[in-house]
Amino acid sequence: MARRALIVGTGVADRIAAGLADDYDVDRTPGAESLDLVVWADYPALACEPRQITDLSPADWDAACDTPLRSAIDLTRTVHAPLAATRGTIVFLVPLMASAGGAEYTALASLGEGVRILAKSLAKTWGAAGITAHSITLDPHAFLAADDAAGIAADNALHDPPLGRVPDDRDDVAPIIDWLASPAAAPLVGSSLVVDGGLWMPG
């Protein structure tokens, strides 16, 4: 019987869904009674556009950061029981800017850091139910237009990625997410992984 995954978001979420499709029945909206894996990457287009914070109206900020963060929190309430039914895993995908900062991406960085901390909090509170929670920080190319991502990567790196390339969302990142949902990864709790080929190496 195939495992069931819920993938929330577009863009990078679509590519992760494609990478997991051979091993999971993939849902894109909540509703299943049991879930082995939930992946969240629901970043609105407004957050992924370069904008000075002073150019964002209160309504813009709500749309780019506060509302999607609240939606992520609400999603966790919805998926708790389905994940508990299988002792499943929830993974939040986070842009590099949440850790390293990014000029003109304050909303995106704030939203990313919000869900990263949410993952840690869930790991502490849901562990007793057998649910594991993690975040994975990805290269800006996973979230931004190519030219914008290249600029952010250059601003935050002292070297080219040791891997020699940016990891592919479907072929490289999706298998890591699949591993996080495996029994072998069960002792790893509340991790904040960085999967960018070695571009950003936090201490």
What role is predicted for each listed range?
Residues 178, 189-203:
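Short C-terminal tail/terminal secondary-structure segment
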Residues 132-142, 181, 194-196:
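Conserved SDR Rossmann-fold cofactor-binding beta-strand/turn motif
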Residues 127-132, 188-190:
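Short, small/polar-rich loop/turn modules that mediate ligand/substrate recognition or access, typified
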Residues 152-172:
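Catalytic Tyr-x(3-8)-Lys segment
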Residues 8-9, 34-49, 68, 89-94, ...:
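Rossmann-fold scaffold of SDR-type NAD(P)-dependent oxidoreductases
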